[in-house]
């Protein structure tokens, strides 16, 4: 005999009816498994309720200050990174930094002064820190803001 689609049945015990509480006098009847009287018998208790103890969300301090919605975020590149990525020197732009994987594309770039610079580089970026500008010019290069 071949198995047909109409012969298929769900596994025994896999399909059970939803328990209807509060119907009749059985184990889930009358008080519906909630016991007699008290808060939990009459209504739901919130998940955050800790039995009268001061709740954790009220014990912890609030966050101070605010986050400026109009702040401009910059991708950071240090002078040492430029020295490592471009040891031969030359012109270094944002596109070159993206190609080397130092920054994401379409990002504003700020050059900071951490590290040493030995090669002469002409860097063009959106912002420079004072120490970065000083190190680039000391190495014989130039710092151009876009």
From Swiss-Prot:
Q: Which domain of life is it from?
A: Bacteria
- Which Gene Ontology molecular function entries are recorded, alphabetically? rRNA binding; structural constituent of ribosome
Q: Which Pfam families match?
A: Ribosomal_L27A
Would you tell me the Gene Ontology cellular component terms? cytosolic large ribosomal subunit
PROSITE patterns membership: RIBOSOMAL_L15
Question: InterPro entries attached here?
Answer: Ribosomal_uL15, Ribosomal_uL15/eL18, Ribosomal_uL15/eL18_sf, Ribosomal_uL15_bac-type, Ribosomal_uL15_CS
Chain residue ranges for the region called Disordered:
1-41
What keywords are annotated for this sequence in UniProt?
Ribonucleoprotein, Ribosomal protein, RNA-binding, rRNA-binding
The record's listing under SUPFAM superfamilies reads: Ribosomal proteins L15p and L18e
Record keywords: Metal-binding included?
no
What is an annotated GO biological process for this record, any one? translation
Skewed-composition ranges (Basic and acidic residues): 1-10
Role description: Binds to the 23S rRNA.
The text of the family note is:
Belongs to the universal ribosomal protein uL15 family.
Q: How does it assemble?
A: Part of the 50S ribosomal subunit.
Q: Which HAMAP family match?
A: Ribosomal_uL15
Name of the molecule in the record? Large ribosomal subunit protein uL15
Q: Which organism is it from?
A: Mycobacterium bovis (strain ATCC BAA-935 / AF2122/97)
């Amino acid at each position: 005999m071949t198995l047909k689609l109409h012969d298929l049945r769900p596994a025994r015990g896999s399909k059970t009816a939803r328990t209807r509480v509060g119907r009749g006098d059985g184990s889930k009847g009358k008080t519906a498994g909630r016991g007699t009287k008290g808060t939990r018998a009459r209504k739901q208790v919130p998940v955050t309720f800790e039995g009268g103890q001061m709740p954790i969300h009220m014990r912890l301090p609030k966050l101070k200050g605010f986050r400026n919605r109009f702040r401009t975020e910059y991708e950071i590149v240090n002078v040492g990174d430029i020295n490592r990525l471009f040891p031969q020197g030359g012109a270094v732009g944002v596109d070159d930094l993206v190609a080397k994987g130092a920054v994401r594309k379409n990002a504003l770039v700020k050059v900071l002064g951490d590290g040493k610079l030995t090669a002469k580089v002409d860097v063009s970026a959106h912002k420079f820190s004072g120490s970065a500008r000083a190190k680039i010019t000391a190495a014989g290069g130039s710092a151009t803001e876009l």
